[in-house]
Structures are given as structure tokens and as C-alpha cells.
Amino acid sequence: GQGTGGGGAGGYRNSFSSETSGGGGSSESAVSGAVGDYTVTAGAGGANPGVGYNRSNDGSNSVFGQITSVGGGAGGTETINAGVGYDGGSGGGHMGNKNQSGDGTANQGFRGGENTSGGGGTGGGGAGAAGADSPASSNVGTAGGAGLASSITGASVTRAGGGGGGTNSSGTAGAAG
């Protein structure tokens, strides 16, 4: 059967002084804006490609004025481009034995997991950690990278975790980050 790597989380940027941005980045400078109109776009996650041997889709960018968080990278599909993961805010995991996950964007997210065995798919990267690598000869999908907790809204909420890796036969899929 066919499997895929997990999708990467969308880019995570934070200006709350006691917290960090994704990918190990420091807190960003707060934005001070004048009264006026601003373009705000909430980027969607990558759409499911459906049944069959179709490439997964990247997430869309989120935009606030001049600030852009990059959409998450798609997970690799074993029959397309040797299963490589795609770059994004956080990188997609991969499927197959090419050992090439997608990269995250600096100060937004981490890479997807790595795999040389050709077994289960690796997890997508998260804001707080890379997707989990796959051990040799494993047919189990690995976990997505952890997100980051933020208390900017009052209560602590974890955001931007990576998607778990899929499996190519009777193995078990990985958990989300």
C-alpha cells in the first residue's frame, strides 16, 4: 500500500516577550501599527489529496500586514519524487528510503523526520522540534514534532505541532506533535 510522511506545521511567530518563535527563534519585536486597514489572511492547512497516488499539498501562508508565516510543508508520498518531504514553515516528513525531509523556515519551524529504511513515514516538523526520525527497518510512522505552548491569550495553549507519519502497509501511523 501507499503511505505518506506527516505534514509540517505552519510557521509560528511570536512577539510575547517571555516566549519564543518556532524553529528555536527568539521572540520577535512587537508590531506597533497606526489606525487603518490591514490585510489579514489565515492560511489553510494542506488539503488532503484524496485516494490514489497523488502528491500531498502544502499549507497556505498566513499574513498580517507585512508579516508572513509560511504554510506547512507537505509530507512526501512514496510514489512521487522518491517520497521526499517538502519545505515550509515547518518541513514535511518523507516516505521511502531517500532520507530527505522538508526543511523548516528559519525562526518559524523545524524540519521533518529522517528515514533511511523505506518503512513507515516520518513525522512533519513542528514549531518546537523536528519530526521524529525513523529507526532502521521500522514499519511504524513516527511522531510529528512538538508544538510550542503560549500563554498570550491567558491560558497556556500549544500550537503548531507537526503531523504524524503514515505507514505503507500494516504498520501503525505516528501521533501528531
Annotate each PLM feature.
Residues 1-177:
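Low-complexity, glycine/proline-biased repetitive segments and flexible coils/loops
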